[in-house]
Amino acid sequence: MDVNPTLLFLKVPAQNAISTTFPYTGDPPYSHGTGTGYTMDTVNRTHQYSERGRWTKNTETGAPQLNPIDGPLPKDNEPSGYAQTDCVLEAMAFLEESHPGIFENSCIETMEVVQQTRVDKLTQGRQTYDWTLNRNQPAATALANTIEVFRSNGLMANESGRLIDFLKDVMESMDREEVEITTHFQRKRRVRDNVTKKMVTQRTIGKKKQRLNKRSYLIRALTLNTMTKDAERGKLKRRAIATPGMQIRGFVYFVETLARSICEKLEQSGLPVGGNEKKAKLANVVRKMMTNSQDTEISFTITGDNTKWNENQNPRMFLAMITYITRNQPEWFRNILSIAPIMFSNKMARLGKGYMFESKSMKLRTQIPAEMLANIDLKYFNDSTRKKIEKIRPLLIDGTASLSPGMMMGMFNMLSTVLGVSILNLGQKRYTKTTYWWDGLQSSDDFALIVNAPNYAGIQAGVDRFYRTCKLLGINMSKKKSYINRTGTFEFTSFFYRYGFVANFSMELPSFGVSGINESADMSIGVTVIKNNMINNDLGPATAQMALQLFIKDYRYTYRCHRGDTQIQTRRSFEIKKLWEQTRSKAGLLVSDGGPNLYNIRNLHIPEVCLKWELMDEDYQGRLCNPLNPFVSHKEIESVNNAVMMPAHGPAKNMEYDAVATTHSWVPKRNRSILNTSQRGILEDEQMYQRCCNLFEKFFPSSSYRRPVGISSMVEAMVSRARIDARIDFESGRIKKEEFTEIMKTCSTIEELRRQK
């Protein structure tokens, strides 16, 4: 029988058909090779947008810097970064006038955070530029290396463990005439292998001390390393993103804390909330505009797109904003917040790995590191690369490019949102003083603008005024990529609005399926994704039930754990059949042990082990969850786990799922090849941190986890905790006098050793 597909949609409102338009199946594109070209593009473009600014030279590093602030106003529609200070300050003043006390209150909240935040805040985050080794490292390692170098240079404020004290060390380090660092290096030598009698290359890892003079240190402290952004869909070209070093991160964190606090109080801000909360917030703004426009006015909405948002933003503008926002606050607070924008106006972009050349005829490959680009003969490069290098050469210092204007991706999302909202705020009638008015939504560089006016001419005038106001603040609305519709249909941050936000379920498709972490986590994540989509994305019960069956099927094929009574032969089927036959209560077997699936859409919130616990044979329970069983990994499981979900569009989302530590929650072993590289020292450091943190967790278990308040080191905190616990246990008779005395003696010994050190 032929089915006419249009019949499927007869009963469906048009907006619900959005999920059928989804183009993103399959894997997103990843980048290969070096990001040097993309970074040079970013640097060159940023300077081009500000080319009519003033050139100056940084007195400390000698880096040439371009300052477009208060530069000539553009005469055409080309993107430009000439923000006008007085306009930005006025926009801030009007924002405060419409929201009395907003800046004052946010400053008070932030001041509290600044005084309480501990330095371990900086261990969050993935890759970080490690200035001591001049390459990227996991955040925790980069922080540890920085602190280690600070201490060996006599900078000790960080020992208090407060972030603000660590930042005092950062400030002081910039005044030092020289800084001594420890770097890793590799020695290669050819030796004869005793067994095979062949020559082999032996690598040994050494650590060596190196002195950096003030200029070299400042360049490193102000450096942002660059990488290529991966997994971006819908783009032909890749682009560069930046990872700042530890000196900058802490200051940025405090600025963003202040900006976040302001955004929370602004109804037009799409940050920092997300998901349903964000949809509700946005729907309110739309409702306000539609109810006011019913009789006399018409209402239109622009789905907006800005050209090169962060390349036209300017740290100097952010400095002006912060100076205004904190104007009645204590000096120390104003200083600490102004450092991030100052560092960004003096930033250097590291060009990455450089270029790879290969000669087909001689079968030779060689890497030209970024440091050599300043004086290498350009005849080896093709035309487009040659142009890039020629353009960037005046800006190069030691393989990094001076990049004063522009912000680099993702650095000040919250603060730039405040800037955007300040323009939306100017759309009130009391400011436009005419018949048109506007409002809208802003989330980082994405915006939606709603304009109301008595007639079409008024709408046009309103849009023009908005466009020109943006130009004054260094924001460039793209006329080519923005489009206008009757209010009621628009898109904002990948949410599609049509008389209400439409659930675009297909966006979530990539996160369905088996993640490949381990059998325990994958089962939990799989059912949690289905549960979340029933809550948030209009996934109906019938479809959810089908998704669940498909997931179980996928899971069984991935881990070769078909039911014990199946005919399918796999590598595991022999073991699974044996287990099936000797199990009395077969319903109690986990799916990953060949058991049946007991999940349905009503019990998705229960971890599988809990769901089947009552049904399990006793000896099976004893093997599955016995903490003494060496195969039960308790290492990662902390009652709640986090998985990173990649939706098809938009940022990766953190998703919490429950999992129970069982023999199935294994952690795969690290690749052994790392042990022979210069990373080995780093690996050992990491393991040491892991051990220290695990020990600390033992003293302060999550259930009673009150952060040790006050200024004490980890060791002091653990010793004092041990003493308190020992006294309580002794007085309640849980431990004997001898044990109590021994604990007290050990504590004193530890303190004595610390004093001697």
From Swiss-Prot:
Reaction it catalyzes: RNA(n) + a ribonucleoside 5'-triphosphate = RNA(n+1) + diphosphate
Source taxon at top rank: Viruses
One protein family per Pfam: Flu_PB1
Quaternary structure annotation from Swiss-Prot or TrEMBL: Influenza RNA polymerase is composed of three subunits: PB1, PB2 and PA. Interacts (via N-terminus) with PA (via C-terminus). Interacts (via C-terminus) with PB2 (via N-terminus); this interaction is essential for transcription initiation. Interacts (via C-terminus) with human PKP2 (via N-terminus); the interaction competitively inhibits the interaction between the RNA polymerase subunits PB1 and PB2.
Domain RdRp catalytic: 286-483
Function comment: RNA-dependent RNA polymerase which is responsible for replication and transcription of virus RNA segments. The transcription of viral mRNAs occurs by a unique mechanism called cap-snatching. 5' methylated caps of cellular mRNAs are cleaved after 10-13 nucleotides by PA. In turn, these short capped RNAs are used as primers by PB1 for transcription of viral mRNAs. During virus replication, PB1 initiates RNA synthesis and copy vRNA into complementary RNA (cRNA) which in turn serves as a template for the production of more vRNAs.
Alphabetical GO biological process terms: DNA-templated transcription; symbiont-mediated suppression of host gene expression; symbiont-mediated suppression of host mRNA transcription via inhibition of RNA polymerase II activity; viral RNA genome replication; viral transcription
Protein's recorded name: RNA-directed RNA polymerase catalytic subunit
Motif (Nuclear localization signal): 187-195, 203-216
Record-linked HAMAP family: INFV_RDRP
Region (Disordered): 53-82
Residue segments, region Promoter-binding site: 249-256
Record PTM: Phosphorylated by host PRKCA.
Family in the record: Belongs to the influenza viruses polymerase PB1 family.
